[in-house]
Amino acid sequence: MSVLVVTGTGTGIGKTVATAALACHARLHGIDVAVCKPVQTGTRDGDDDLAEVARLAGVTELHSLARFPEPLAPLAAARRSGAELPTRAQILDLITAADRPGRLTLVEGAGGLLVEIASDGSTLRDVAADLGAPVLTVVAPGLGTLNHTVLTLEALAHRQISSAGLVIGAWPAQPGVAEIDNRDALSRLAPVRAALPAGAGSLGRADFERLSVDAFDPSWVEGLAA
């Protein structure tokens, strides 16, 4: 099984763009790739993360279980829509069915690592632990990111879940002292796999492909699918 879970230190941190960039890089290097988003909220406002991944990355193997209209945490969004979150078993079945030998299967969470995404209160951390999958954490570059990143990494370590490193989700065109210092500090916490420029999600396919192919170390990505 070659599953990589993608989480973030918060909502709106750039998980979907990071997932798309990694998926795009893998595709351009000849790696079979699938993307799972078990729970999606905010569809009423046009949020459709898998559609965004398809637009940016050109990936067609896309898998989801539950979609809720309001841009809320999954549990609240499900309750307000009169529905229930999927079960933990359903989420695990979705991911294992999408994965296959030689394929890199990316699993994007909703919100942060410890947000409830299943009907029994299970979180993305629980899913990663069940799968024995490493977790890539998307982080912000600005003030507050060090504390948020450490908390997420400690939450992974508490369950003996491997960290696959960090992606800076929105690196500014003109970084200030805080961003530059934070990038150095983040690299001491875990490997920084990429620093994606702010606004990358607004690029067209060709420009996004050029960005993605240079964003990650090809040997690291190939190792994920091995």
UniProtKB/Swiss-Prot annotation:
Residue positions of the active site: 37
Q: InterPro entries of this UniProt entry?
A: DTB_synth_BioD, P-loop_NTPase, SDR_fam
Keyword field: ATP-binding, Biotin biosynthesis, Cytoplasm, Ligase, Magnesium, Metal-binding, Nucleotide-binding
Q: Biological process (GO) annotations?
A: biotin biosynthetic process
Per its UniProt entry, which superkingdom is the organism in?
A: Bacteria
Listed under GO cellular component are: cytosol
Binding residues annotated for substrate, in chain numbering: 41
Subcellular localization is given as: Cytoplasm
Q: Which positions bind ATP?
A: 12-17, 49, 108-111, 197-199
**UniProt xrefs under SUPFAM superfamilies:** P-loop containing nucleoside triphosphate hydrolases
Q: What class of enzyme is it?
A: ligase
**One Pfam family it belongs to:** AAA_26
* Pathway info: Cofactor biosynthesis; biotin biosynthesis; biotin from 7,8-diaminononanoate: step 1/2
Catalysed reactions, semicolon-separated: (7R,8S)-7,8-diammoniononanoate + CO2 + ATP = (4R,5S)-dethiobiotin + ADP + phosphate + 3 H(+)
* Similarity field: Belongs to the dethiobiotin synthetase family.
Describe the function of this protein: Catalyzes a mechanistically unusual reaction, the ATP-dependent insertion of CO2 between the N7 and N8 nitrogen atoms of 7,8-diaminopelargonic acid (DAPA, also called 7,8-diammoniononanoate) to form a ureido ring.
Q: What is annotated about its quaternary structure and interactions?
A: Homodimer.
- PANTHER family, A to Z: DETHIOBIOTIN SYNTHETASE
Name of this protein? ATP-dependent dethiobiotin synthetase BioD
Its taxonomic placement starts with:
Bacteria, Bacillati, Actinomycetota, Actinomycetes, Mycobacteriales
